[in-house]
Amino acid sequence: MANVSPLNFDRFDRQIRFLGKRAQKLISTTKVLMLGTGGGNSQVSIQLACMGIGELFLVDPDRWAETDRNRVFIPREFVGKRKVSTLKKLIEEYFPDVRVDGIVTKAEYLPDEIYKEADIIVVGTDTISSRIYANRKAIIYRKPALFPYASIYSEKGKLRQFFGVLQVYIPGKTPCFECWKNFDKYRLLAESLDPKRREEFRQRYNLGDELNIPVEASVSALNYIIAGAAVWEILKIITSIDKPIPLQAYNGISRSGRLMERINLKKDPNCPACSLARRLKSNSSLPSREDLIKLGEKR
């Protein structure tokens, strides 16, 4: 937990009315590790800052592009600059009571000390392989972790898919990211290979576009919905105001009338990350590049 100066309860009056002062103190002493600071996680970071979170670790190797501005509220002069440094500056300017650490790196290269120090991990990275890596770290250090994801797909001018998913991992209680197995085997395989080996696999297995890594469509409306759900789950974890939902989804083209639907998910007794067999096999459950390639070939 982060050390903070005395709280200005007036600033947090509206949330204290239902959370209480004790919960606000918990929020203001909590450290959250944000892996990825794109359209979704940047929103989660700002919302947490609004609510007075104690400390944010912002982790991302990338720079802002002009194409980010359709879903992220950033000034034009931020384009071309590091995401973490500019977001850190923005939060510190408007929320000086929040401590912000900006780290320009990938999740895979982040020092273990940061994973250990964080109270909660929010995994908003672009690649499946980095999400698997973060999942293993959450398991090793017994940290609650959230995995928000949004996807839009259209075909021949018709919207086919407009949905978001939020998974919450609570150590020892809920299924982990890899229990779900809901990731594209070809995408995982492509991410695990350098361009030369990717072409070798393409020829060996007679693959076409399956090993291409596409640029996905994205819009602020969908990111904000999933980000809002993530912040609420984070508040549940911090304050115990309600039980976290292990897996929920938003379907923007469904006629069910529900904003977020719960999805039943059970622990996989043979999960390569969190199963008892895996934990007994090794003290370190981090996947190697060869492990990722094998996962991609199997699924």
Name each region found by the language model.
Residues 54, 98, 141-143:
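A short helix->loop->beta-strand "cap" motif at the edges of active sites that frequently abuts
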Residues 23-65:
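Glycine-rich adenosine-cofactor-binding loop
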Residues 2-7, 26-33, 113-299:
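Glycine-rich phosphate/adenylate-binding loop
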